[in-house]
Every structure is written in C-alpha cells, then in structure tokens.
C-alpha cells in the first residue's frame, strides 16, 4: 500500500502520550490512528508496530521513540510515544521530540501512579505548555463514583504542579474498546472527543519564523574591505539587512547593524529560521565576537549565569560517568555552540547523583550565556557527553 502524502495545508502541532507504565499510552496511540484512519486522516498503526520503537540519538544520548502522524479536520499532528520510562525522561529533557502539548494517560482502574506524577513534574520542568487527560480502561470500572474519585485525584495532581487542574479536559474511555471493536461509546466516540479536546485546548505553537530573531554564532571571519562576517544557522525569526541587532553572551552585550546577509555565496535581503547564513556586521572587529555568543533582536534575550535545571545523567553503558557526583561538581555546560564551565548545586536532601538518575539542580556558570527557559544543553567532561538538561527557570 502506497503511503498517502500528507498535505501540509493545516497548522502543524507536536504532541505525545505520557503517563505510568501499562496505563495504555501505546494502545491509545494505536487507537487514535485507527479512529482517524476511518476519516482518511491517518494510517492505522497497530500496537506492536508502535511498541518496537526505533532507537535514535539526540545530544549523544540513545532514545527509543515511536513517531506516528495523523490529522484532524483542524490540524496535522506528529505524535511521539516511548516504550520505557527512561526513554520518556530522556526524551523530555533533551527535547528530542519537541512537545507542544501532551496527552496524559491514566488508568481508571489504578488511578495516578508514581510515573504519572513524575511525567507531570517533567512536563512542568521542561515547559510543555498544555496537557489533556485520557482516563483509560473505564470499561474495567463499574462504579461511577470511583471514576469521579480518580478524576479528582488527577486534577489535584495537575494543580500541584502548576497546571490548571480544574480546567484541563479529562476524557473517559477505553483504548482497547477501539482496538477490539467493542464498546463504541467508550472507544470510538471517546477518542473523537479526545481529539476534539486536543484540537481546542492545546494552543497552536508560534512558528519559529514568527518569533524574535536569534542566531547562535558558529564562526567569525574577517573579510578585507568588507568587515566582519558571523556565520550560523538562524534558530528563529527573521533578520533583514539594515536592522539593528545585539550580540549577547560571554562578554558585555553590544549593539551593531547587519549590513549584509549571505547564503550559498549569494546576497539576500533577509535570513530566516532554518537558514545557514553569514551576517556582515557594521563596525564590529573580528575579536569583538566569538563562538558561543548569539545575534538576536535587541532586548529579546538576556545573558545569565545562574539557573535551575532538570537534567538526566547518562549511565556507564550509555557512555556516561561510572561514578556518582556531588554538590560542587564542575563539568562543562554545552549551550548551542560552546562549552562553559559551571558549578552544580544539588537540592537539599539529595546527597549525590548516580549515573542514570534525573535530577533538579542549580547551576552557576563562570561566564554569562544568552538563555531563557526551555533552552536545552549537554553536560560534558572533556568533550564527552555525560548528561543532558533543560533550563527550568532563571535565577539571575
């Protein structure tokens, strides 16, 4: 069967299923593709197809993830599902599969469990903007009061981690009912209702090109008679010739003007998100700019040295450390294009961090870096990746 080509005429959104092991994340993913396939918006992907997730590398870390795509009348979705809990932790922290929203799957028969809590906390730490809940396995619960109790527990848990627990849509159903063609009300209808809620409740992400301009500096050249050219890939936004920009990070912030934009040796009047460009900077000397800084729209990003982060520390088998580390550990933090040394402070009550752990930590960098919440980084020792992290909040 030939794969139908998805027409990109609808807004695109990245989502994923999260929740405790065996609560039905993968079954729900399969059920969504089955229900939407009837309307021609997907190709049905069976449970065992999704379950044997291929391995991929992100920031030097191997993660297993399954990707399916489907569309509703309003949107096109890329949906990610992970086989194991460790894969979720790694995926959310590295941002390997960016999530604009998540479907939290909770088994009605069991209620919230430890990983339910951990995934909600991770979603908060890594900045997942919105969550919709699917209360699964409702066909296994006869008592409607019990369902209400589980729903209340889930709402309280979401509120505890600063999600709007009272407002979040909770859809009750059964993924198995879809896959076994049994109860259409709990199966087919519930999945359609879930997708309606996802369409309506998960906000449409702003496209990178509509965000304020930012380009990490990869290289700096001096071109005789023309000035200094800075190269890199535009991360977001648009830069036009003649616009004023700032150079942020490592040293005091400087202002300059872009007098030319080049791509593939051709002159352009602008560069935009995704382009690999060379930007000619007015009156800027070769030694004024270095790799690791960013060019950005004035005032849009500030340099910082202290932040709180959520990090995953690689196991020995993944090529990470063989031993734990303690407070005052001093690795390098690789942001965008460069390593900066930083000092780690562990939270009260955390004596040490073992390889394979994920941990909330505070980091003090020795020089300021252009950063904002949700920025990803690698933790390295002498060029070897030993962990991955994401900025949860900025201190100063």
From Swiss-Prot:
A GO CC term assigned to this protein in UniProt: cytosol
The enzyme's E.C. designation: 3.6.5.3
UniProt KW keywords: Cytoplasm, Elongation factor, GTP-binding, Hydrolase, Magnesium, Metal-binding, Nucleotide-binding, Protein biosynthesis
Residue span of region G3: 81-84
CDD domains membership: EF_Tu (cd01884), EFTU_II (cd03697), EFTU_III (cd03707)
Localisation: Cytoplasm
Domain tr-type G intervals: 10-206
Keyword Cell cycle carried by entry: no
Amino acids binding Mg(2+): 26
Top EC class for this record: hydrolase
GO molecular function: GTP binding; GTPase activity; guanosine tetraphosphate binding; translation elongation factor activity
Region (G2): 60-64
Keyword match Ubl conjugation: no
Region called G5, residue ranges: 174-176
Catalyzed reaction equations: GTP + H2O = GDP + phosphate + H(+)
Binding site for GTP: 19-26, 81-85, 136-139
Function per UniProt: GTP hydrolase that promotes the GTP-dependent binding of aminoacyl-tRNA to the A-site of ribosomes during protein biosynthesis.
PANTHER family per UniProt: ELONGATION FACTOR TU, MITOCHONDRIAL, ELONGATION FACTOR TU-RELATED
NCBIfam families in the cross-refs: EF-Tu (TIGR00485), PRK00049.1 (NF000766), PRK12735.1 (NF009372), PRK12736.1 (NF009373), small_GTP (TIGR00231)
Protein family: Belongs to the TRAFAC class translation factor GTPase superfamily. Classic translation factor GTPase family. EF-Tu/EF-1A subfamily.
HAMAP family: EF_Tu_B (MF_00118_B)
Summary of subunit composition and partner proteins: Monomer.
Protein name as catalogued: Elongation factor Tu
Source organism (scientific name): Nitrobacter hamburgensis (strain DSM 10229 / NCIMB 13809 / X14)
Gene name, Swiss-Prot/TrEMBL: tuf
């Amino acid at each position: 069967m030939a794969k139908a080509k998805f027409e990109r005429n609808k807004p695109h959104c990245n989502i994923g299923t999260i929740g405790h092991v065996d609560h039905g994340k993968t079954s729900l993913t399969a059920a969504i593709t089955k229900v939407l396939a009837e309307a021609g918006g997907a190709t049905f992907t069976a449970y065992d197809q999704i379950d044997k997730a291929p391995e991929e590398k992100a920031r030097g870390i191997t993660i297993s993830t399954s990707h399916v795509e489907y569309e509703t009348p309003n949107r096109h979705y890329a949906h990610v599902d992970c086989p194991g809990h460790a894969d979720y932790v790694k995926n959310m922290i590295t941002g390997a599969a960016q999530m604009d929203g998540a479907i939290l799957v909770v088994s009605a028969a069991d209620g919230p469990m430890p990983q339910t809590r951990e995934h909600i906390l991770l979603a908060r730490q890594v900045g997942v903007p919105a969550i919709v809940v699917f209360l699964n396995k409702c066909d296994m619960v006869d008592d409607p009061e019990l369902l209400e109790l589980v729903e209340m527990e889930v709402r309280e848990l979401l509120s505890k981690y600063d999600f709007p627990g009272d407002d979040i849509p909770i859809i009750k159903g059964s993924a198995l009912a879809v896959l076994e063609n049994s109860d259409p009300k709990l199966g087919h209808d519930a999945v359609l209702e879930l997708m309606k809620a996802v369409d309506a409740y998960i906000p449409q992400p702003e496209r990178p090109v509509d965000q304020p301009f930012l380009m990490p500096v990869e290289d700096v050249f001096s071109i005789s008679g023309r000035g200094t050219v800075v190269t890199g890939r535009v991360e977001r936004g648009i830069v036009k010739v003649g616009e004023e920009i700032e150079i942020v990070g490592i040293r005091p912030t400087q202002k300059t003007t872009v007098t030319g934009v080049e791509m593939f040796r051709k002159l352009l009047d602008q560069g935009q998100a995704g382009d690999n460009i060379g930007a000619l900077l007015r009156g800027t000397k070769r030694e004024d700019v270095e790799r690791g800084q960013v060019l950005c729209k004035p005032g849009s990003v500030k340099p910082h040295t202290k932040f709180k982060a959520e990090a995953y520390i690689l196991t020995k088998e993944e090529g990470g450390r063989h031993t734990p580390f303690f407070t005052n550990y001093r690795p390098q933090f690789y942001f965008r294009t460069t390593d900066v040394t930083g000092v780690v402070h562990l939270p009260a009550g955390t004596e040490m961090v073992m390889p394979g752990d994920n941990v909330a930590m505070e980091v003090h960098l020795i020089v300021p870096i252009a950063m904002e919440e949700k920025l990803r980084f690698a933790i390295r020792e002498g060029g070897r990746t030993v962990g991955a992290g994401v900025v949860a909040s900025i201190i100063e």
